Amino acid sequence: MNSLDANTRNTKSKGDVRSLRSAGNIPGIIYGGPDQNQKVTVLKKTLKSLIDKGSFLSNIITLNLDGKPQNVLPREITYNVISDEPTHIDFLRVVPGVKIRIEVPVVFINHETSPGLKRGGVLNIVRRKIELKCPSEKIPSAITIDLDGVDIGESFKISSVKLEEGVTPTIIGRDFVIATLAAPTVMKEPEKPAEAEAEAAEDGKEAAPAAEGDKKDDGEKKATEEKK
């Protein structure tokens, strides 16, 4: 489990928050559970390194607030529209037994042992993330789809995914598709329109008499030369 150090934040104005960011820190807040919301600050450099690892918003982390560890789930990150740098972060307290909604990434493995992919098949991914409802202590890091032995024409539906007890997709009532393995697309040369074929045939008919006329002219020219 990843960890992140945080400190209690006592900012009271926008100027205080700007000064905080200028010093390389990111303001945030912890909410949820029986405790009150708490303002915090984290080091931007450390936060960005965790974000770059991927699936940051889908994994519980240990937040060491003023040296005291607590489990939280990163819920939302606000970014600067120009620099794309993080400017604020929300953390949700993890309370055992309490169910939450969370998007979990879909990961595909064993591409190299799929006969369908070896024959040029195309993996069409319909959903790269799936929203689940689950207890905070049972959040899966990812939904894994095994492509081993999968051939062209096969598909993966949510019913084929084994989830822990108490973990369910938020979409209910239908067995939605996650991905399919389709046949390779072959580009065919467009057929010549019937009108174009008819015009080509007419051009051929017109060219034939002209050729015969040229042949006749050549014969007459040769006979004249012999008389001379």
UniProtKB/Swiss-Prot annotation:
BP term (GO), one: translation
Record's keyword terms, sorted: Ribonucleoprotein, Ribosomal protein, RNA-binding, rRNA-binding
Database matches in InterPro entries: Rbsml_bL25/Gln-tRNA_synth_N, Ribosomal_bL25/Gln-tRNA_synth, Ribosomal_bL25_b-dom, Ribosomal_bL25_C, Ribosomal_bL25_long, Ribosomal_L25_dom, Ribosomal_uL5_bac-type
Disordered as annotated region, ranges: 1-20, 187-228
Biased composition (Polar residues): 1-10
Residue stretches of biased makeup (Basic and acidic residues): 202-228
GO molecular function: 5S rRNA binding; structural constituent of ribosome
One GO cellular component term: cytosolic large ribosomal subunit
Domain of life: Bacteria
Pfam families noted in UniProt: Ribosomal_L25p, Ribosomal_TL5_C
Family of the protein in this entry: Belongs to the bacterial ribosomal protein bL25 family. CTC subfamily.
Protein role: This is one of the proteins that binds to the 5S RNA in the ribosome where it forms part of the central protuberance.
Assembly: Part of the 50S ribosomal subunit; part of the 5S rRNA/L5/L18/L25 subcomplex. Contacts the 5S rRNA. Binds to the 5S rRNA independently of L5 and L18.
Protein name: Large ribosomal subunit protein bL25
Source organism (scientific name): Pelagibacter ubique (strain HTCC1062)
Classification lineage: Bacteria, Pseudomonadati, Pseudomonadota, Alphaproteobacteria, Candidatus Pelagibacterales
